[in-house]
Amino acid sequence: MNLFALLDQTAARHGDRGAVYHGERLVHTWSSLRERALRLASSLREFGPGARIAVASENRPEIVELMFAIWAAECVFVPLNYKLHVREMEQILSDAGAARVFTSPKIGAELAPVASTGIEIIGAAEYESRCAAMPSPAPRDTDPASPAWLFYTSGTTGRSKGAMLSHRNLMAMTVSHLADFDCPDENSSLIHGAPMSHGSGLYVPPYVSRGARQVVPASGTFDPDEFLDLCESHPGCSAFLAPTMVARLVQTGRACPANLRTIVYGGGPMYVDSLKKAMAAFGPVFVQLYGQGEAPMTITGLRRRDHLDAPDAVLGSVGYARSGVDVAVLGPDGAPWRSARSARSSVAAMW
């Protein structure tokens, strides 16, 4: 099992349809995205299976091809939040043992003085030469337990900590999302308003699996008016947004675009009053998720219909356990615990 199979299958079904857009501009069809990813994968094999390949960039279309190329090469995708200080990035690169880091021109220039890892600039001549390599065969025998994504969280000690996510983990996340939250198809779009290093990027696999186009805002960041404009021009739009981003959409005073279908919110507290204002402005498009680095996007949540006529206690909660997930509160001895005092939460799933 290798996550590249999601792109492989979609390219076979929808090869000539648009796959990746930069704003409203078509960058790749599914067939051309597959070929470019396999060409990149061929060049990345020099680092060997299991090599950690980092990406540090503002949102840009190449992140999608890099993600699948890294998986096709049976390497590990290590995305870095582009908002981090370069010394924090270097700490992650060192901790991960990254063999290479692909960066935007801006981040590459800032990172170069402190990085001990080799830097390549996305879109530069060296990068494009990689994309001209002979295509690698699609992977067929990847161990599903092998790592696919090294997800760095803020941690509790002031130093980022990496959660190792396998191909099986991310496939389970993909199936869970499609079972519980959204039903995209080839006439749908995923708008990458939030950083692709985290929640928005984690949603690439489920939407690619259904042939939904990947839309990267031309600004490379979150601008509420640009986001809403993209939801007017692309079909069947879904997105992952932080609660603060949802609030900024409401502040525009604009009506809900006709093509906006789903906003999954998470990654921070959504206050009940803020959620009610968002629902009044945009209607029943909201889905809530609660997860963590070790169980990305996959612990609890509220579906769109769970928000309808729900009491404040439900709207202010983290929702219900997701399909295939068992959530419990345990005491120090691991037994079920009825008091919040000295308790810890436990999550189990079919990973």
For each predicted feature, which ranges?
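Conserved AMP-binding/adenylation subdomain of ANL enzymes
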Residues: 171-189, 199-237, 252
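ANL superfamily adenylate-forming
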Residues: 106-145, 159
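Conserved structural elements of the adenylate-forming
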Residues: 33-39, 144, 163-185, 193, ...
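Gly/Ser/Thr-rich phosphate-binding loop
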Residues: 212, 236-240, 250-312, 326, ...
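AMP-dependent adenylate-forming
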Residues: 6-29
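Conserved pre-ATP/AMP-binding loop-to-beta segment of ANL
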Residues: 15-16, 134-152, 159, 183-189, ...
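Conserved AMP-binding/adenylate-forming
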Residues: 26, 41-84
